[in-house]
């Protein structure tokens, strides 16, 4: 009976089946194992190559889980673990921001919800909407009544407030010269104030009785347009020469003059809108006429002429 050959005590039963003492290629991976994903560390010990976020620090292949993540203990799934503070809320792994009054979502952005009277200015700050065009509440002498004079002789207070599709107006006149303050020593007096505006709603001072431009009440800017305060040329078209008059261009009313002795004298007030177009520079016109027709003159001596406020409304031009 033949004897089996005895294996060397240094024989390695793992491929390539060589004696460690005689092997010319120590620690070569077996032919059926790819080096991709594996490494020998230390030599002769096969292990996995791990890069973040994988680790075998605990003896098994695991994910390194940082703050905000957790592994579900029931099914082993990876889940977020984010905590939120008020006003944020969390529901079904979604973070929400409750929206209160004054806020809205617009084009997937959180925005301020502005009501009437508010707007965004050029710096994207919330500002009061410029819906008031005026002379100011108490102007200096700014208007010329006496024909041919160069210096203002009266104070015109004019306030125009946009309200939807109309403008609400307020006007009053105060004398600032001997000429104006002696007018009511007469029984019959007519005081005429003409305002001519360009295409952007700015006063043309060389042709207007008012010699200073009207201003916005809030945040005056040098290049603002006041067109939206002007009387609509559709509602109040200019009257062509020899074409008669348009009654819709006239607003009639009454205010009062209080004499030095306390007596009240009615003044007929006529507001004429786009009465006539004097030249190519003019796009809008407002004319104010105060008329006194009294049996007796209100004054016997000089007294400051002050008309009571007169209010009116008209359809405005589009902005």
UniProtKB/Swiss-Prot annotation:
Give a Pfam family name.
Adeno_shaft
Q: What induces it?
A: Expressed in the late phase of the viral replicative cycle.
Give the GO terms filed under biological process for this record. adhesion receptor-mediated virion attachment to host cell; cell adhesion; symbiont entry into host cell
Gene3D superfamilies found in the cross-reference section: Adenovirus pIV-related, attachment domain, reovirus attachment protein sigma1, domain 1
What is the annotated localization of this protein?
A: Virion; Host nucleus
* Classification via InterPro entries: Adeno_fibre (IPR000931), Adeno_fibre_knob (IPR000978), Adenobir_fibre_prot_rpt/shaft (IPR000939), Adenovirus_pIV-like_att (IPR008982), Attachment_protein_shaft_sf (IPR009013)
Which keywords, in A-to-Z order, does the entry hold? Capsid protein, Host nucleus, Host-virus interaction, Late protein, Repeat, Viral attachment to host adhesion receptor, Viral attachment to host cell, Virion, Virus entry into host cell
What is the protein's major site of localization? virion
Per the record, its GO cellular-component terms are:
host cell nucleus; viral capsid
- Shaft repeat boundaries on the chain: 44-73, 82-103
Miscellaneous notes: All late proteins expressed from the major late promoter are produced by alternative splicing and alternative polyadenylation of the same gene giving rise to non-overlapping ORFs. A leader sequence is present in the N-terminus of all these mRNAs and is recognized by the viral shutoff protein to provide expression although conventional translation via ribosome scanning from the cap has been shut off in the host cell.
Subunit structure and binding partners: Homotrimer. Interacts with host receptor CD46. Interacts (via N-terminal tail region) with pentons.
Q: What does this protein do?
A: Forms spikes that protrude from each vertex of the icosahedral capsid. Interacts with host receptor CD46 to provide virion initial attachment to target cell. Fiber proteins are shed during virus entry, when virus is still at the cell surface. Heparan sulfate might also play a role in virus binding.
Give the domain note: The tail region anchors the fiber to penton base capsomers, whereas the shaft, built from several repeated motifs, allows the knob to protrude from the virion.
User: So what family is this one in?
Assistant: Belongs to the adenoviridae fiber family.
The protein depicted here goes by the name: Fiber protein
State the organism of origin.
Answer: Human adenovirus B serotype 3
Upper lineage ranks? Answer: Viruses, Varidnaviria, Bamfordvirae, Preplasmiviricota, Tectiliviricetes
């Amino acid at each position: 009976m033949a004897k089996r050959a005895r294996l060397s005590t240094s024989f390695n039963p793992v491929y390539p089946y060589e004696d460690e003492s005689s092997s010319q290629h120590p620690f070569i991976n077996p032919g059926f194992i790819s080096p991709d994903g594996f490494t020998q560390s230390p030599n002769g010990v096969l292990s996995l190559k791990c890069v973040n976020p994988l680790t075998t620090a605990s003896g098994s292949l695991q994910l390194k889980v940082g703050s905000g993540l957790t592994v579900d203990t029931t099914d082993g799934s990876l889940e977020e673990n984010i905590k939120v503070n008020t006003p944020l809320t969390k529901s079904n792994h979604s973070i929400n921001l409750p929206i209160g009054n004054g806020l809205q979502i617009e084009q997937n952005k959180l925005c301020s919800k502005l009501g009437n009277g508010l707007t965004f200015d050029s710096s994207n700050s919330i500002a009061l909407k410029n819906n008031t065009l005026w002379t100011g509440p108490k102007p200096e002498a700014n208007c010329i009544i006496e024909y041919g004079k160069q210096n203002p002789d009266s104070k015109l207070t004019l306030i125009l407030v946009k309200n939807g599709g109309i403008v609400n107006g307020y006007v009053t006149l105060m004398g600032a010269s001997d000429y104006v303050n002696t007018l009511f020593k007469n029984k019959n007096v007519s005081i005429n104030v003409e305002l001519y505006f360009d295409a952007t709603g700015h006063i043309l001072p060389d042709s207007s009785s008012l010699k200073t431009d009207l201003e916005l009440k809030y945040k005056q800017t040098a290049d603002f347009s006041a067109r939206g305060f002007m009387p609509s040329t559709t509602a109040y078209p200019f009257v062509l020469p020899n074409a008669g008059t348009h009654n819709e261009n006239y607003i009639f009313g009454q205010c009062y003059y209080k004499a030095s002795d306390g007596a009240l004298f009615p003044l007929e007030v006529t507001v004429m809108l786009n009465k006539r177009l004097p030249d190519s520079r003019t796009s809008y016109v407002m004319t104010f006429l105060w008329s006194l027709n009294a049996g007796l003159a209100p004054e016997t001596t000089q007294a400051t002429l002050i008309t009571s406020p007169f209010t009116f409304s008209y359809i405005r031009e589009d902005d």
